[in-house]
Curated annotation (Swiss-Prot):
The chain crosses the membrane at residues 36-56, 70-90, 110-130. The lineage of its organism: Bacteria, Pseudomonadati, Pseudomonadota, Gammaproteobacteria, Pasteurellales. GO terms for cellular component: fumarate reductase complex; plasma membrane. It is a multi-pass membrane protein. Belongs to the FrdC family. This is Fumarate reductase subunit C. Anchors the catalytic components of the fumarate reductase complex to the cell membrane, binds quinones. Its main location: membrane. One of its GO terms (molecular function) is succinate dehydrogenase activity. Keywords: Cell inner membrane, Cell membrane, Membrane, Transmembrane, Transmembrane helix. Gene3D superfamilies: Fumarate reductase/succinate dehydrogenase, transmembrane subunit (1.20.1300.10). Part of an enzyme complex containing four subunits: a flavoprotein (FrdA), an iron-sulfur protein (FrdB), and two hydrophobic anchor proteins (FrdC and FrdD). InterPro entries: Fumarate_red_C (IPR003510), SQR/QFR_C/D (IPR034804). It is found in: Cell inner membrane.
Amino acid sequence: MTATTSKRKKYVREMKPTWWKKLDFYKLYIAREATAIPTLWFCLVLLYGVISLGSLDSFGNFISFLKNPIVIILNIITLGAMLLNTVTYYVMTPKVLNIIVKNERINPNIITMALWAVTAFISLVILVFMYV
């Protein structure tokens, strides 16, 4: 079997490292994808908290760890990242969710408001049960 080689030069599109800085859409995309880093931080803190529930001494250390100003700042950054992730998810969902009722597509604002209503309701229920 013989292999034929082409004398044509392959087209390779140049991809610069700053491709995402051209459009605001790309910047938001990168910011949304970067929320994985604060999510990892939150998961590690949560894991540390669950492990420290084993004894009172380690749980006391966990509480003092949470009171550290650096940890508080990192948790505030994590909260902001999760809010960004939630907002972009709720804006994107009606665009990809195609619900048709009586041969008409549902208004995207209704879906977005329903998502926020469910979020508010669940948050309220958690807050009520936390203090009861």
